[in-house]
Amino acid sequence: MYQSIAMATNHGPSGYEGTGSFMHSATAATSPVYVPTTRVSSMIHSLPYLQTSGSSQQGSPVSGHNMWAQAGVESSAYNPGTSHPPVSPRFTFSSSPPITAPSSREVSYSSPLGISANGREQYSRGLGATYASPYPAYMSPDMGAAWTASPFDSSMLHNLQNRAVTSRHPNIEFFDDFSEGRECVNCGAMSTPLWRRDGTGHYLCNACGLYHKMNGINRPLIKPQRRLSASRRVGLSCANCHTTTTTLWRRNAEGEPVCNACGLYMKLHGVPRPLAMKKEGIQTRKRKPKNLSKSKTLTGQSGSDSLTPSTSSTNSMGEEMRPIKIEPGLSPPYDHSNSISQASALSTITSHGSSYYPMPSLKLSPQNHHSTFNPSPQANSKHDSWNNLVLA
């Protein structure tokens, strides 16, 4: 590949090497982009970064050479131990020495301000070097290499903490309700399901806060004593009989407390109750329960209801027990015995219970009665034959 390039360059001089090149030709002089060489040389001398040598280019190996060097020097400098032929004697650049180690290549960072050479060297470093600092190192390089970051040491957690501090809920009281160390200013309670505030901003427990909200006054600290029963009020005695126990305390015309008995007696008779009527115990009525009369009426109704079906059943049975009219010549041989059994069954049914129904309620036709006791001769013959079979 490089041989082909070399062969192509050896065929003849380049277009810009001859006398009729673009920069020295007459057509180039009339071109708008044409720059005379005198102006170029003056511009090159005025530029600080293209000067031959200076205090600012001491650390760079490239700064020791001129940009526009001679052809012979350029050819020897461009090919230090290489087989590449020279390209152009006019526009050639000097090459840097071969890089042997990464530390040999250094890049200097210079400030455009007017700083001395020592100051520039202080703030310049190579690729493998570190900045020089007047302060001591926080930790040694060995410790820094062996240090491993913890799984919780990340910038995300720090951002979350800062965000939590900045984005605090505006209603701070809502979060402060769960804090410890509060005390109710009224009752001194340390714990409550809900902390409240009074009109002045002091903290109240839930009970004191609700009491203050409903009644408008502070909740009393001492619970009121339970009201004693009327029969055992402390310090009360009847002004008439001087008793201390009663079911109901009353007042007389003078406003003095009296027992229930003396008060009723005075109200009914208009005179004070005599002391001879005083009793040790309190007489109470033996009141009957109000549901007792209702239960009795219910039992009476149930008894009457239980009797009515039996009477109706006996009437229906009596109607069913009535004999059926039979023609005189077709009476069965067991008619007489059947009538007796029916009569006995009817007597047992009617005699059930306390009620008794007489036999005349059963009406029999005279024809049937005559037929039962006076059968026809044909029926008698059949009846006799049947009796003979039974007796045999």
From Swiss-Prot:
<dbReference type="GO" id="GO:0000976">
    <property type="term" value="F:transcription cis-regulatory region binding"/>
</dbReference>
<feature type="region of interest" description="Disordered">
    <location>
        <begin position="359"/>
        <end position="392"/>
    </location>
</feature>
<keyword id="KW-0805">Transcription regulation</keyword>
<feature type="zinc finger region" description="GATA-type 2">
    <location>
        <begin position="238"/>
        <end position="262"/>
    </location>
</feature>
<keyword id="KW-0479">Metal-binding</keyword>
<keyword id="KW-0677">Repeat</keyword>
<dbReference type="GO" id="GO:0000978">
    <property type="term" value="F:RNA polymerase II cis-regulatory region sequence-specific DNA binding"/>
</dbReference>
<feature type="region of interest" description="Disordered">
    <location>
        <begin position="75"/>
        <end position="113"/>
    </location>
</feature>
<dbReference type="Pfam" id="PF00320">
    <property type="entry name" value="GATA"/>
</dbReference>
<dbReference type="GO" id="GO:0045944">
    <property type="term" value="P:positive regulation of transcription by RNA polymerase II"/>
</dbReference>
<dbReference type="GO" id="GO:0005634">
    <property type="term" value="C:nucleus"/>
</dbReference>
<dbReference type="GO" id="GO:0060070">
    <property type="term" value="P:canonical Wnt signaling pathway"/>
</dbReference>
<dbReference type="GO" id="GO:0008270">
    <property type="term" value="F:zinc ion binding"/>
</dbReference>
<feature type="zinc finger region" description="GATA-type 1">
    <location>
        <begin position="184"/>
        <end position="208"/>
    </location>
</feature>
<feature type="compositionally biased region" description="Polar residues">
    <location>
        <begin position="364"/>
        <end position="380"/>
    </location>
</feature>
<dbReference type="InterPro" id="IPR000679">
    <property type="entry name" value="Znf_GATA"/>
</dbReference>
<dbReference type="GO" id="GO:0045165">
    <property type="term" value="P:cell fate commitment"/>
</dbReference>
<dbReference type="InterPro" id="IPR039355">
    <property type="entry name" value="Transcription_factor_GATA"/>
</dbReference>
<feature type="region of interest" description="Disordered">
    <location>
        <begin position="279"/>
        <end position="339"/>
    </location>
</feature>
<keyword id="KW-0010">Activator</keyword>
<dbReference type="GO" id="GO:0045893">
    <property type="term" value="P:positive regulation of DNA-templated transcription"/>
</dbReference>
<comment type="function">
    <text>Transcriptional activator that binds to the consensus sequence 5'-AGATAG-3'. Associated with cardiac specification and can regulate cardiac-specific transcription during embryogenesis. Activates the expression of cardiac MHC-alpha in vivo.</text>
</comment>
<keyword id="KW-0862">Zinc</keyword>
<keyword id="KW-0863">Zinc-finger</keyword>
<dbReference type="GO" id="GO:0048738">
    <property type="term" value="P:cardiac muscle tissue development"/>
</dbReference>
<protein>
    <recommendedName>
        <fullName>Transcription factor GATA-4</fullName>
    </recommendedName>
</protein>
<feature type="compositionally biased region" description="Basic residues">
    <location>
        <begin position="284"/>
        <end position="293"/>
    </location>
</feature>
<dbReference type="Pfam" id="PF05349">
    <property type="entry name" value="GATA-N"/>
</dbReference>
<feature type="compositionally biased region" description="Low complexity">
    <location>
        <begin position="302"/>
        <end position="316"/>
    </location>
</feature>
<dbReference type="InterPro" id="IPR013088">
    <property type="entry name" value="Znf_NHR/GATA"/>
</dbReference>
<dbReference type="InterPro" id="IPR008013">
    <property type="entry name" value="GATA_N"/>
</dbReference>
<dbReference type="GO" id="GO:0000122">
    <property type="term" value="P:negative regulation of transcription by RNA polymerase II"/>
</dbReference>
<keyword id="KW-0238">DNA-binding</keyword>
<feature type="compositionally biased region" description="Polar residues">
    <location>
        <begin position="91"/>
        <end position="113"/>
    </location>
</feature>
<dbReference type="GO" id="GO:0003677">
    <property type="term" value="F:DNA binding"/>
</dbReference>
<keyword id="KW-0804">Transcription</keyword>
<dbReference type="InterPro" id="IPR016375">
    <property type="entry name" value="TF_GATA_4/5/6"/>
</dbReference>
<dbReference type="GO" id="GO:0000981">
    <property type="term" value="F:DNA-binding transcription factor activity, RNA polymerase II-specific"/>
</dbReference>
<keyword id="KW-0539">Nucleus</keyword>
